[in-house]
Amino acid sequence: MEAKSESTQASESWSSHPVYARYWQHYHQAMAWMRSHQSAYQKAVESVVTSPWYYPATDLAQSPAAKGGTSPKSRSKSPSASGDACRRRSRPGKPGPQRRSTEKPARFAEDNDSESDDCGIVCDLSNMVITDELRQYFAETEQHREELRRQHQLDAARLKDYVNADHGLYCDKRGRSTLPPTERPGERRQAEMKRLYGASAAKIQAMETAMQLSFDKHCDRKQPKYWPVIPLKF
């Protein structure tokens, strides 16, 4: 019992350390937000269910209209209208619901045609004035779009050169080539060293070469891996 109490006290002391105070603050805020979200969702569902306009799917399936019966409004129609409806239902191969479904798209098509005609009158852009501010806005929008496109290209190129953490430090994703070199090995580096250090270029290059050889020796012996860097992309 004493060992168990000591272990619980150790865990409590670890979690109540002042270093983790900010973490627990964020944790409690997130839990409070989650509870308020669940409460709001439950209230919304209850308000929809208790609404007088809410009809479950089972009620709609059992309604007289779904079964092919007549609604109270249709009962108040004249006998001639009801007789016409009966004659339409008595025709073979042309039931009533299918006729209603064919009439409704035609009516919607007429409404859409009338709305499109109205929009053609309202959305007349022949007399639209393009100001300097509008031109500047279009130019800035195009510039931002071009910058975003270039940024996407750079991200894609950087992603191709990305090396996973399970590879070593000398992982070459481009692969080896059997073609002869286009220039002498070390010629470009030697010219760069001479441009940077002048007369002392040979001595400094020898020191860098010795340091690089020592680094390669330790890498071959230890075989280190890359430290995993996980980017956060929201």
UniProtKB/Swiss-Prot annotation:
It comes from the Eukaryota. Residues 67-83 have a biased composition (Low complexity). GO terms for cellular component: cytosol; Gemini of Cajal bodies; SMN complex; SMN-Sm protein complex. Residues 100-110 have a biased composition (Basic and acidic residues). Keywords: Coiled coil, Cytoplasm, mRNA processing, mRNA splicing, Nucleus. InterPro entries: GEMIN8. Residues 60-116 are annotated as: Disordered. It holds the Pfam family GEMIN8. One of its GO terms (biological process) is spliceosomal snRNP assembly. It is found in: Nucleus, Gem; Cytoplasm. Residues 130-153 form a coiled coil. The SMN complex catalyzes the assembly of small nuclear ribonucleoproteins (snRNPs), the building blocks of the spliceosome, and thereby plays an important role in the splicing of cellular pre-mRNAs. Most spliceosomal snRNPs contain a common set of Sm proteins SNRPB, SNRPD1, SNRPD2, SNRPD3, SNRPE, SNRPF and SNRPG that assemble in a heptameric protein ring on the Sm site of the small nuclear RNA to form the core snRNP (Sm core). Part of the core SMN complex that contains SMN1, GEMIN2/SIP1, DDX20/GEMIN3, GEMIN4, GEMIN5, GEMIN6, GEMIN7, GEMIN8 and STRAP/UNRIP. Part of the SMN-Sm complex that contains SMN1, GEMIN2/SIP1, DDX20/GEMIN3, GEMIN4, GEMIN5, GEMIN6, GEMIN7, GEMIN8, STRAP/UNRIP and the Sm proteins SNRPB, SNRPD1, SNRPD2, SNRPD3, SNRPE, SNRPF and SNRPG. Interacts with GEMIN6; the interaction is direct. Interacts with GEMIN7; the interaction is direct. Interacts with SMN1; the interaction is direct. Interacts with GEMIN4; the interaction is direct. This is Gem-associated protein 8. It comes from Bos taurus.
